[in-house]
């Protein structure tokens, strides 16, 4: 629902350092810059380990997407896994399972599909209004390129949330969401509807 209001910036951080970065940005934007915006941050009570903050991720956190960990060197296929919020732990678990099958994984954290969509729409508008100039790339395109590497985005939200950015994703983009919201009383029960 938060994505339907253009004055709302909706966030779904997975880790404490993402939350801290978003709060710091939000305070600056609302207080120091006096912007008429609301920051809606989904914060969960699920207990899981918090890793240290990687270097040079602030821009990606605020833009909505950053690479948490690159694929290990080696042979075999690569997949890009995108997670947000507490389901990131299952993304990290999936990496180990995929390694058993010889599949290497890049791990990406999506802190805001709404911000990614906002950027994509702004770039599309600029390109439409400036047909005589070289086309710009949106942030997703600059990060993920035009690769044939499969991308799987998983979310504890309905699949419609990560699907908001499908237009700017490379071709091999699949979305898995927990569309059983309202039919469950716990996160584990919610994930029974994961598809």
Task: Write out the residue ranges for each language-model feature.
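Thiamine diphosphate
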Residues: 3, 10, 18-22, 27-195
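Ferredoxin-type iron-sulfur electron-transfer modules in oxidoreductases and energy-metabolism complexes
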Residues: 15
């Amino acid at each position: 629902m938060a994505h339907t209001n253009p004055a709302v910036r909706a966030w779904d951080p997975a880790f404490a350092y993402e939350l801290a970065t978003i709060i710091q940005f939000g305070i600056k934007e609302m207080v120091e810059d006096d912007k008429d915006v609301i920051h809606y941050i989904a914060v969960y009570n699920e207990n899981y380990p918090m890793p240290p903050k990687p270097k040079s991720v602030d821009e990606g956190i605020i833009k909505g997407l950053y690479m948490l960990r690159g694929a290990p060197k080696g042979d075999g296929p690569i997949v890009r896994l995108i997670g947000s919020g507490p389901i990131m732990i299952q993304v990290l678990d999936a990496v180990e399972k995929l390694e058993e099958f010889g599949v290497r994984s890049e791990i990406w954290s999506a802190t805001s599909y709404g911000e990614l969509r906002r950027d994509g729409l702004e770039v599309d508008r600029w390109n439409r209004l400036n047909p005589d100039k070289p086309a710009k790339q949106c942030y997703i395109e600059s990060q993920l390129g035009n690769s044939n590497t499969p991308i799987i985005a998983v979310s504890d939200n309905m699949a419609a949330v990560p699907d908001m950015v499908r237009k700017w994703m490379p071709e091999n983009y699949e979305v898995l969401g927990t569309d059983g919201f309202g039919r469950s009383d716990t996160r584990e029960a919610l994930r029974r509807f994961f598809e």
